[in-house]
Design a protein with these regions (language model features):
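N-terminal transmembrane alpha-helices
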Residues: 8-40, 44-45, 59-74, 78, ...
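Transmembrane helical elements of multi-pass membrane transporters/channels
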Residues: 19-38, 140, 174, 203-207, ...
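Small-residue-rich hydrophobic transmembrane alpha-helices
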Residues: 51-111, 148-167, 273-331, 335-337, ...
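Short runs within selected transmembrane alpha-helices of multi-pass transporters and secretion channels
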Residues: 72, 141-159, 167-175, 196-209, ...
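Short alpha-helical transmembrane segments in multi-pass integral membrane proteins
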Residues: 1-21, 79-146, 188-243, 299-364, ...
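Interfacial/gating helices of multi-pass transporter permease domains
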Residues: 19, 42-62, 129-133, 193-194, ...
């Protein structure tokens, strides 16, 4: 059974949603800081080539990480659904099956990232001066991919159980270890991009050990047995939810990798500036991202308990919270982007290029507040095929073509390339509004017939 704090089917929606969201936001802030520290330390104590390598290599790592997170969303939603339905005895098989599936995924990613690190770097159009360092960064992160996958799986399990505080502790451990590692390996031993990658993998490994220990000590409302660790029927259920999300996220991240490649064609300073801007973008997207993740568990529990109206109300509450914060972030990014960029680099050209991208990207901080809450609602409502569909439309028909078009213009600029993101997101909002109206009408028709 869920305790009162983890029971989202009753009580004030705003208070419950914010209380559940805040630890997720805290974890995402630490994760963003975790990634930013690599760029910050390399930018201060490494080379410009090393900065470009971390920028480009982290785009590859982000692709893998975000796809894994969306894959794991299937586990989060299914666990929350079983809690809402008061059937916790099924959760052990979900966790055991998830461990097997994600281990298989780790092996495949290990082979791809370690064996093809250099071709990946070339495909990303890393500047010639930074290809070797980029390949080294990707290869080292690939060698430790098991820990990165395991961390995200464990976090998904805890969130499905209504516990958003434990993942915050996991990432806190990782962040502290990563900072120490960067200072020792990059600032102290001058290992440049390779040192940043080693620090990242070491930090993730220690956080996984901590997470496993915490899960074993947790008072769970179900049992996990050896027979659960196999490809069982629950695998098909969480894959049905997670696969569409993972595919959609994969193609979305591919579009951002392509965007990175478009920018790399503009030169080393543009590449480094874009990398700095992306770290700021990561921070700007934290509240919408935390709302989306918390919304999935919140909605899934209420759908499982038969409280569809409450599930819809939670979506609108999330949009309101996101817009309130988004207005503040929009002003900071649009008018103080150069100050934000100067935190990560002292190079005037890098700062100028980073700020140029942020000017075009700025409206994204507002429209994403709406889109992500809607996507979180549909994820929790098991409409992940739709989430995939609308995501693919945004990526393949809007964001990628528009960014490419902007990049090949004679007067190409990072500001114009940055506009591709908010334009695509706006299209996504209209698509989701239409689908929401369609579902409501279908639900009303079904109610009348019954």
């Amino acid at each position: 059974m869920t305790n009162d704090k983890a029971d989202f089917t009753q009580g004030n929606i705003l208070k419950k949603l914010v209380a559940f969201m805040m630890p997720i936001l805290g974890a995402l802030i630490l994760q963003a800081a975790y990634g930013a520290v690599d760029l910050l330390v390399v930018g201060r104590f490494g080379s410009t080539s090393g900065l470009s390598a971390v920028s480009t290599g982290s785009q590859v790592l982000n692709l893998v990480t975000f796809v894994v997170i969306q894959f794991a969303m299937g586990i989060t939603v299914l666990i929350a659904r079983y809690l809402g339905e008061k059937r916790p005895e099924r959760i052990g098989a979900v966790i055991g099956g998830g461990a097997v599936v994600f281990t298989m995924m780790s092996v495949a990613l290990f082979i791809a990232m370690v064996g093809f690190a250099r071709p990946i770097s070339v495909l990303m159009q890393a500047p010639a001066e930074a290809v070797d360092l980029t390949a080294s960064y990707v290869r080292i992160c690939g060698a430790g991919i098991f820990f990165i996958v395991a961390y995200n799986l464990l976090s998904a399990i805890f969130r499905g159980l209504g516990d958003s505080k434990s993942p915050l502790l996991f990432v806190l451990v990782a962040c502290i270890v990563n900072i120490i590692g960067d200072l020792v390996l990059v600032a102290g031993l001058h290992m440049d991009a390779a040192g940043a990658a080693i620090a990242t993998v070491t930090a993730q490994a220690l956080s996984v050990v901590f997470a496993v220990m915490l899960l074993l000590k947790k008072d769970l409302p179900f049992a996990i047995t050896k027979k659960d660790f196999r490809l069982n029927p629950q695998c098909r259920k969480f894959l049905k939810i997670g696969l569409p999300l993972a595919l959609q996220e994969f193609l979305t991240q591919i579009s951002f990798l392509a965007l990175c490649a478009f920018v790399n064609r503009l030169g080393l300073e543009a590449s480094s500036g874009y990398g700095v801007a992306c770290k700021i973008v990561n921070f700007a997207m934290l509240v919408p991202s935390s709302l989306m993740q918390s919304m999935a568990s919140f909605v899934s529990q209420n759908i499982g308990a038969g409280k569809k109206k409450r599930a819809k109300q939670s979506m609108f509450t999330g949009i309101g919270v996101g817009l309130a914060v988004g207005c503040v972030v929009f002003v900071l990014v649009l008018f103080k982007g150069d100050v934000l960029c100067s935190v990560f680099s002292t190079d005037a050209a890098v700062i100028q290029n980073g700020f140029a991208y942020l000017k075009g990207f700025a409206p994204e901080t507002l429209v994403t507040a709406i889109l992500f809450s809607m996507v979180g609602y549909f994820n929790g409502n098991n409409k992940t095929v739709w989430v995939m569909t609308q995501g693919l439309i945004q990526t393949l028909l809007v964001r990628l073509p528009l960014a490419y078009f902007m990049s090949i213009q004679p007067n190409a600029s990072l500001t114009k390339i940055g506009l591709a993101a908010p334009v695509a997101t706006t299209v996504g909002i209209f698509l989701n509004i239409g689908f929401f109206i369609y579902l409501n009408r279908a639900e009303q028709s079904k109610s009348i017939l019954s």
